[in-house]
């Protein structure tokens, strides 16, 4: 389990400080450490978990990712400006992630008329796709559906729902392929206050391995 050794070290640190306080005060009491006291014993929080945005925004979608220490929320941003069809990709993105961006653009272009988007948008506008926390490398294909949604949102002006997270690889035909790390991703969504997560149909079978408290019974029907 990722982080268990670090957790053991932090617990040991709390125990040492409690023992020292008892020894210094010569008291003979039982000490109960609660969450409010953790900052006193361990200092200011070193990490923070991502939280869902409060407002729906155009061109911004909540994705999900898996890191070496568990799942995380992944913010996907898309901005369109007048230009000549240049696509800028930033956020320390790996090769597979960049290929996913290109696939998402092609999917949107192939369905532009159906979606109410100018079919020649790729000739008249520049796209900038960014994933914040640029110091953290990002890779993998599972952001495909989020990228498509962010692109459609920015090109139509329709805000994407901030309280909805999504994950899934997308093909050029618009099919959504299964992903890995579903448990970690759902845990990240749960921590972030997100109650609705869109997952590939083929990952439905993986829900049997997910703690029931993370999803309603409707999700497995």
Go through the PLM ranges and name each one:
Residues 30, 48-53, 57-62, 69-217:
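Peripheral, non-AAA+ core regions of ATP-driven protein-machinery
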Residues 6-20:
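C-terminal helical "lid" of AAA+/P-loop NTPase domains
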Residues 31-46:
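Amphipathic alpha-helical
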